[in-house]
Curated annotation (Swiss-Prot):
GO annotation, cellular component aspect: ribonucleoprotein complex; ribosome
Domain of life according to the entry: Archaea
Keywords: Metal-binding, Ribonucleoprotein, Ribosomal protein, RNA-binding, rRNA-binding, Zinc, Zinc-finger
Protein residues bound to Zn(2+): C6, C9, C32, C36
ZnF start-end (C4-type): 6-36
A Pfam family reported for this protein in Swiss-Prot or TrEMBL: Ribosomal_L24e
One annotated GO molecular function: structural constituent of ribosome
Protein name as annotated: Large ribosomal subunit protein eL24
SUPFAM superfamilies: Glucocorticoid receptor-like (DNA-binding domain) (SSF57716)
Underlying gene: rpl24e
InterPro entries in the record: L24e/L24_sf, Ribosomal_eL24-rel_arc, Ribosomal_eL24-rel_N, Ribosomal_eL24_CS, TRASH_dom
Role summary: Binds to the 23S rRNA.
Cofactor: Zn(2+)
Biological process, per Gene Ontology: translation
Amino acid sequence: MKIYKCAFCGADILPGYGIMYVKTDGTTLRFCSRKCFVSAVKFKRDPRRLAWVRKRQK
């Protein structure tokens, strides 16, 4: 069993959870929640600027 990291916030994703998004060029992005998915794909937000993201630069 492999534990993946969220492409947006860096949280651990357990097997059977999360969203896998495949781009048209074949790369896969894994997200822990819909909140991360929408922030990254739809709104194209920078995770370093959001307070709730673990990847945030301090």
